[in-house]
């Protein structure tokens, strides 16, 4: 019986070739687009899913009277710290970072990279795990740097690089060696390391180095992500 169904279907296809082809192409296109849309929606739903207490994580966004005063995704540098101090029962933790682009070098290899200068709470706040290093002390030293697994391999060709150094240039042109104190497992998709399509930070430095880069965390700085 099933064989007869196939024969009938094939007869109809060959008898009405153009319309059959049109229907098949239309159906195939619809199925493909359905899968593509489903894949896109699923991918978007996975953003931040792996963060600690993801449902209780919030970005501070700003609405400036003067649009040129700052960005919607940034706010005044001390704000989240002040909120934690003034409302300890409401704000359990915070993480602020300033994104910059700088030149990194290792031997004769030179790289232009986005850096994230932030609070030492990065790992405890979001639950990112280190494959090498101590999460409790990774950002204690002023010249400490934490790299993702991807960047460790890019710069050194391996991941077990604790104690190794990489040179980072400031905006004034001075160069300083930073010691690798942690190697981060490549994080699942999130809006902390990849806040925009143009921003994908994989090099993390303690905010103790703000002066080296000519940055600050005072009320005059409206370009801090919190």
Give names to the regions the model predicted.
Residues 119-132, 147-226:
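Mid-to-C-terminal secondary-structure elements
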Residues 1-31:
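N-terminal Sec/SRP start-transfer signal
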Residues 64-66, 104-106, 168-172:
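Short acidic, glycine-rich loop/turn motifs
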Residues 22, 29-58:
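Alpha-helical transmembrane segments
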Residues 67-78, 109-113, 140-143, 187-201:
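Solvent-exposed, non-transmembrane alpha-helical starts
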Residues 58-63, 76-131:
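Short amphipathic beta-strand/extended segments in non-transmembrane regions
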Residues 13-16, 23, 44, 60, ...:
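Generic structural signal for small/hydrophobic residues in well-ordered secondary structure
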């Amino acid at each position: 019986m099933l064989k007869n169904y196939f024969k009938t279907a094939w007869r109809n296809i060959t008898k009405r070739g153009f319309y059959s082809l049109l229907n098949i192409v239309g159906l195939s296109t619809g199925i493909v687009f359905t899968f593509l849309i489903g894949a896109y929606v699923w991918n978007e739903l996975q953003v931040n899913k792996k963060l600690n207490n993801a449902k209780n994580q919030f970005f501070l966004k700003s609405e400036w009277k003067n649009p040129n005063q700052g960005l919607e995704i940034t706010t005044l540098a001390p704000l989240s710290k002040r909120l934690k101090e003034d409302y300890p029962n409401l704000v359990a933790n915070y993480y602020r970072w300033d994104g910059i682009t700088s030149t990194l070098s290792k031997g004769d290899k030179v790289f232009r990279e986005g850096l994230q200068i932030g609070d030492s709470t990065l790992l405890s706040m979001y639950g990112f795990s280190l494959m090498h290093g101590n999460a409790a002390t990774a950002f204690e030293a002023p010249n400490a740097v934490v790299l993702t697994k991807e960047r460790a391999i890019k710069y050194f060709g391996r991941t077990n690089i604790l104690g190794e150094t990489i040179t980072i240039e400031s905006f004034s042109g001075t160069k300083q060696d930073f010691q690798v104190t942690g190697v981060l497992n490549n994080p699942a998709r999130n809006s902390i390391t990849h806040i925009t399509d143009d921003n994908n930070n994989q090099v993390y430095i303690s905010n103790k180095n703000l002066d080296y880069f000519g940055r600050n965390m005072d009320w005059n700085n409206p370009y801090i992500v919190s």
